């Protein structure tokens, strides 16, 4: 058994050094290319409307606010200023969402975003996005990359298609630090020792983002009140939780396997599902010794088996917001196909470590 485990870890490390590193290098090259275009478009937006200031900056060869959805699909989070006059309200009525309401006694005119405040005093995510979409459309026509970039039509999201190969969503957002959403109050679970009080304090201080995008749970049937809501996102908190042991290596292997074998019709699975299941695996195996390099094979198998279970139950709860189902709206047939394909993949890795050479 130990010999088999060692063989799997050896093959996984080989897979990581060959396949995963090649994927990372290719994506890094794409990101540089994509960010040149996006920066140019955002510079043009800022000229027209100084409230939308580009926050896309390179730090230690990484772009702040850039999320990789898939090798040809990205999201850039554009951080907006001055949320101060609004109260953050999440009463759980919209899973995964919250609203920003003008603080009592504050005048609308005190807000930088005065014309996007609804009659009831809410800062409308939809109105801000609509204005931003108009500005981006104008910027695309004026920017120096206008021959290679165009807006994606038929969506309320702000999406660019670059060189007919890549899609980038640009999402206006507010960064919320020093507060923690009520809808995530159950985290961390009292009976689970991971991640420990110090890391919990760091994560909660890191806070979360509020994104102006279509809510998971409402796609296609939004009332105007609901579309004024903001989507909760915890990217920085999640990344902080995955910093030690072989967690990041495990995520890299999962993303590479997804890109190569689980890119399926109906798009049932994305990288975020992999990240979510990795976080649950951290809770199941709370000791740092469980995340030693020698345990990489066991952790990977555990996550793939959990993924199959989620696909069969057609439910994948968000890590911080368990009332939010990340499979919401996915076609059942696509989830079924993904379950079968994941099972084939897990069986192959488990029964024959050398199969990773071909995967």
UniProtKB/Swiss-Prot annotation:
UniProt keyword terms in alphabetical order: Cytoplasm, Developmental protein, Nucleus
Lineage top rank: taxon: Eukaryota
One cellular component term from this protein's GO annotations in UniProt: nucleus
Disrupted-gene phenotype: Severe lens and retinal defects leading to lethality.
Gene Ontology terms: biological process: camera-type eye development; closure of optic fissure; cornea development in camera-type eye; embryonic camera-type eye development; embryonic cranial skeleton morphogenesis; embryonic eye morphogenesis; enteric nervous system development; eye development
Cited SMART domains: Mab-21
Pfam families, A to Z: Mab-21, Mab-21_C
Locations listed in the record: Nucleus; Cytoplasm
InterPro entries for this protein: Mab-21-like_nuc_Trfase, Mab-21_HhH/H2TH-like, MAB21L/cGLR
Family: Belongs to the mab-21 family.
Role description: Required for eye morphogenesis. May promote the survival of proliferating retinal progenitor cells.
PANTHER family per the UniProt record, alphabetical: CELL FATE DETERMINING PROTEIN MAB21-RELATED (PTHR10656), PROTEIN MAB-21-LIKE 2 (PTHR10656:SF37)
Protein name as it appears in the record: Protein mab-21-like 2
Gene (UniProt): mab21l2
